[in-house]
Design a protein with these regions (language model features):
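Eukaryotic intrinsically disordered, low-complexity regulatory linkers and tails enriched in Ser/Thr/Pro
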Residues: 3-460
Length: 460
């Protein structure tokens, strides 16, 4: 079913049949230019904004169709709406009359809704949209940015959609707290920054509660996981650990064991139970065991509780048979099928050839592990956006990933560092393929080269 959106102060949308929902129509003039800046077409036209597209029917009978996923940036100013496309074309809409504000807001809102659908992948909603006024950079020495917005709370994320500009995603695991201050909602992030939403009216307290409840539920899940992992653990240790361990973020096994003694051994047993034992043993024998990170995310559904477990193992050795410059990402859940191990470069290949594990990239390995985790969190741990070939991103089936890649720099970085994936066939074949991939990685010259199984050895 299509998503129905309201544009402007009056909910004017209508159906054209076959699932097409028109948000608004208006007359205007447009100018379309190519990547070289030369005008391709300029004419008066009738514009039609739909849930996922903008179309123009010119006076001479020609038409132009623009998917919202193909629009990279928009800017509305001085009664003109300017948009740049993924193919380098630029579009200017003007002479819109009294529909200017509605069209500008409608395009921005529709693009934000599209991006939310693409990134959050149908994640359940805790609290439906609440209108308010966003204040950012509200420090004494800064002039705050103020604009109207909508706030929506999902299962693991707070989404803020400014009236002008792209939506702001705030994972609950990145939040330090939420409070009511001077009749406004203040959301504080772990990095020390914050933003404020005012003019919420009667929705102020319900919105605060929805965010606070989501944060509390995540913390309780972490505590339950730790207690389940080490039943004899001291409650004080679990309480202290829950302040540092966040859902969706992998934690160093050494640190975890310091916070909750016995958790390292218990986690190894848990990995064995999740059929990750052989992978864990081999990868940590190749990599730096004390730098290994593990993450657990517990999800609940009608079928019961599922633990999603993942590993990051940095492999940095330059010795024969263990050549590294890679981070191994291994993941599984109880209902997972078609498992694979994913590998990402740590350093540019030229740097590794020149300096080995003494290069500057390896000196900041923890930051690179953090960056890899953040990228996976940004795409809700979906793996398809990582390994799909560039050409497939332009097919209708995977267009949502193309839009996400344009808008999420962490995903672009992850794809740029992606070496390849090794499918779990049988243990011996998997180990052979891992060795082959690592050897390829240290011998390849260009950073954009990816590993693939030899012809006749399917990796699907």
């Amino acid at each position: 079913m299509p998503v129905l959106l309201a544009v402007g102060t009056q909910n004017k949308y209508y159906h054209l049949g076959k699932g097409i929902v028109v948000l608004m129509e208006c007359s205007l003039r447009f100018s379309l230019a190519g990547p070289d800046g030369m005008t391709i077409k300029a004419d008066d036209a009738k514009a039609r904004l739909e849930v996922d597209s903008l179309s123009l029917v010119a006076n001479d009978g020609t038409s132009h169709f623009f998917s919202l996923r193909d629009i990279v940036t928009t800017r509305s100013q001085d009664f003109r709406i300017e948009a740049t496309m993924v193919n380098g074309q630029s579009l200017v809409l003007f002479k819109i009359g009294d529909k200017y504000e509605d069209l500008a807001k409608g395009i921005n809102r529709s693009r934000n809704e599209q991006l939310i659908r693409d990134l959050l992948m149908q994640e359940p909603v805790r609290k439906q949209s609440v209108p308010g006024e966003l204040r950012m950079g509200a420090h004494e020495e800064q002039k705050p940015l103020i604009c109207k917005c909508e706030v929506r709370v999902y299962q693991s994320t707070v989404a803020i959609m400014p009236e002008k500009g792209e939506f702001i995603r705030l994972p609950l695991s990145n939040l330090a707290g939420v409070s009511v201050e001077k009749f406004s909602l203040t959301i504080r992030k772990e990095d020390g920054s914050f933003l404020t939403v005012g003019k919420l009216g009667r929705e102020l307290e319900p919105l605060r509660k929805a965010i606070a409840d989501g944060m509390a539920e995540q913390t309780l899940r972490i505590k339950a996981l730790l207690k389940d992992l080490v039943p004899e653990a001291d409650p004080i240790n679990i309480e202290n650990a829950s302040r540092l361990i966040k859902e969706g973020k992998a934690v160093n096994l050494v640190l975890l064991d310091q916070l909750v003694p016995g958790s390292w051994m218990a986690m190894e047993k848990r990995l064995e139970g999740a059929d990750l034992g052989p992978q864990y043993q081999l990868l940590t024998s190749l990599g730096i065991k004390e730098k290994t990170r593990v993450g657990i995310k517990r999800t609940r559904s009608e079928e019961g509780t599922t633990d999603y477990i993942w590993l990051f193992v940095p492999i940095t050795s330059t010795s024969s048979g263990k050549a590294g410059n890679a981070i191994a990402f291994e993941a599984s859940s109880e209902d997972d099928t078609g498992r694979a191990t994913y590998f990402f470069r740590i350093a540019p290949r030229e740097e590794f050839r020149r300096s080995g594990a003494e290069g500057e990239s390896f000196a900041d390995l923890d930051r690179i592990l953090d960056r890899t985790n953040a990228a996976l969190e940004a795409i809700n741990f979906r793996r398809e956006p990582i390994y799909l070939e560039e050409g497939k991103l332009y097919t209708p089936e995977y267009s949502r990933y193309r839009y996400a890649m344009m808008k999420v720099p962490e995903l672009r970085d992850l794809r740029a560092r992606f070496i390849g994936r090794v499918i779990h066939s049988d243990p011996l074949q998997w180990a052979t393929d891992v060795s082959d991939l690592l050897s390829f990685n240290v011998s390849a010259k260009d950073d954009d080269q990816r590993w693939a199984k030899k012809e006749g050895e399917p990796n699907e």
